[in-house]
């Protein structure tokens, strides 16, 4: 995504509505940016308010699973367990960074990728076009703009009885030229509702599943953005991210009882995206503070570099889409291909050297990863707590 900046003892673990854990140990980066046999899903409507454009999707998906659950093999003689294939869910895996990451992991033969996508057929075509081994991926429907869809995804995933070792929250929408807000099926401004709230609910619901994993390194990765970091040049390009006092978020981002912007200001499509990415990075850190010590799960965020050709810019003006890639390649020298960015995210998923929790990873010109600093707002502990608590209420967890 071009705008995006970038063992453990087995235990019994549960998350309550207050976001606290009950644990019982047993043995213990100018820019950078199966399904079971069948699944039937109703697409939710994306609603607009006060003259905003209406987006409606209603339909059903029915498809066969493309792979079976990998088994855990037992070594003979010594009774040791042979490491099984890892299982990773990647949202937004039908294009861009998500697809590149899915391909990079699947091609190793060491990972089974659950491609969680809104458009099943698009994802299926993308996987085939990318040459991904059929036995190493499964496509499942997920519309992050619908909380019901998120819940149904979790239920369907659990029915598959597949383990969950890593969750990658990658999907995002971006409407930089929008003058009026569009809303999700639940009435939230679309950028924040999809990029932040949808992922927030998904992560919370799947936290239990992650903790049950017997994989050596369990991880929850939320893709961040350099544009949400005001300590960078890209982060200071107007409009700058600013969550303010969260009055819009607390009001439900519905454009009726409150502003559709987190800070309560007038709507700006580009700022809404940047604000959503600040929420993503704050959420990662709050996950780390609340759950890392008790669960051993690694929580991380990243900026994989400037993917100037990404489909994330499909809503931008044509001139921008034409000039931005060569600008990044030849002027800023910050351009990163989708394939390279996918390899970087795959590193955060699988590399033993990147298990540190609470970290925001970036890459230098030599493609070496390093721990980057977040802006003052994106690392504000109290604001992270408030975003967490308000988000819990909005998605029905409190």
UniProtKB/Swiss-Prot annotation:
Subcellular location: Plastid, Chloroplast
GO cellular component, one term: chloroplast
Record-level Gene Ontology MF annotations: protochlorophyllide reductase activity
Pathway involvement of the protein, from the record: Porphyrin-containing compound metabolism; chlorophyll biosynthesis
One of the GO biological process terms: photosynthesis
Lyase keyword on record: no
Reactions catalysed, as given in the entry: chlorophyllide a + NADP(+) = protochlorophyllide a + NADPH + H(+)
EC numbers: 1.3.1.33
Enzyme type, top EC level: oxidoreductase
Key words, A-Z: Chlorophyll biosynthesis, Chloroplast, NADP, Oxidoreductase, Photosynthesis, Plastid, Transit peptide
InterPro entries linked to this entry: NAD(P)-bd_dom_sf (IPR036291), Prochl_reduct (IPR005979), SDR_fam (IPR002347)
Cystines in this chain: none
Purpose of the protein: Phototransformation of protochlorophyllide (Pchlide) to chlorophyllide (Chlide).
NCBIfam families per the UniProt record, alphabetical: LPOR
Family from the record: Belongs to the short-chain dehydrogenases/reductases (SDR) family. POR subfamily.
Name used for this protein in its record: Protochlorophyllide reductase, chloroplastic
